[in-house]
């Protein structure tokens, strides 16, 4: 099962691989069940995995920055 393959959610590189996989599935209606498109599927999944890891790292860095900024703010209590 793949994540949402909408183009606005992915990089150009992954979108190109997604398009190639969909095209392969259209061209090989029956052979896709026998592994004809598996290489493209693996490449697409690897690209999506890298994209996911990048997003996780960026989110983690952002969260750490937010925590640091919250700790540095002076506490203003009346």
UniProtKB/Swiss-Prot annotation:
Disulfide bonds join 14-47, 24-37. Residues 11-55 form the CHCH domain. The keyword Disulfide bond applies. GO terms for cellular component: mitochondrion. It holds the Pfam family Cmc1. A motif (Cx9C motif 2) lies at residues 37-47. Keywords: Disulfide bond, Mitochondrion. It is found in: Mitochondrion. Residues 52-78 are annotated as: Disordered. The keyword S-adenosyl-L-methionine does not apply. This is COX assembly mitochondrial protein 2 homolog. It comes from Danio rerio (Zebrafish). The lineage of its organism: Eukaryota, Metazoa, Chordata, Craniata, Vertebrata. The gene is cmc2.
């Amino acid at each position: 099962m793949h994540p949402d393959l909408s183009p606005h959610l992915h990089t150009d590189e992954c979108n190109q691989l997604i398009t190639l996989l969909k095209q392969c599935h259209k061209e090989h209606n029956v052979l896709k069940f026998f592994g004809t498109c598996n290489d493209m599927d693996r490449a697409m999944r690897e690209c999506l995995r890298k994209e996911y890891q990048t997003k996780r790292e960026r989110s983690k860095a952002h969260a750490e920055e937010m925590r640091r900024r919250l700790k540095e703010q002076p506490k203003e209590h009346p």
